[in-house]
């Protein structure tokens, strides 16, 4: 690697809108990152995720074409 071309790697405080915060390392000069979601509040990590079926599209598709098993052909 060439000398004196890489940015400084400093400790960075990451804070989320949910109130959680943790320390990591980054090249951001300010030393702070504000995030909207993190592993503490994201639905995937908290287990509170919901599958939204907007307007019953899946049910309408299954009613129209039937619920075929994987690998079956007509």
From Swiss-Prot:
Keyword Ribonucleoprotein attributed: yes
Molecular functions (GO terms): metal ion binding; rRNA binding; structural constituent of ribosome
Functional note: Binds the 23S rRNA.
Keywords associated with the record: Metal-binding, Ribonucleoprotein, Ribosomal protein, RNA-binding, rRNA-binding, Zinc
Protein name: Large ribosomal subunit protein bL31
Record's note on what induces expression: Induced in response to the thiol oxidant diamide, suggesting it is part of a disulfide stress response system. Oxidation of L31 may cause ribosome stalling, which would decrease the protein synthesis rate, allowing the bacteria to concentrate on stress survival.
Family note: Belongs to the bacterial ribosomal protein bL31 family. Type A subfamily.
Keyword check for Transmembrane: no
Subunit composition and interactions: Part of the 50S ribosomal subunit.
Xref: Pfam families: Ribosomal_L31
Cofactor: Zn(2+)
GO biological process, one term: translation
């Amino acid at each position: 690697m060439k000398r004196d071309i890489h940015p400084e790697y400093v400790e960075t405080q990451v804070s989320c809108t949910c109130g959680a915060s943790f320390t990591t390392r980054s090249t951001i000069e300010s030393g702070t990152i504000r995030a909207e979601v993190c592993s503490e509040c994201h639905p995937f990590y908290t287990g509170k995720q919901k599958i939204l079926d907007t307007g019953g599209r899946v049910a309408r598709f299954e009613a129209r074409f039937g619920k075929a098993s994987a690998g079956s052909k007509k």
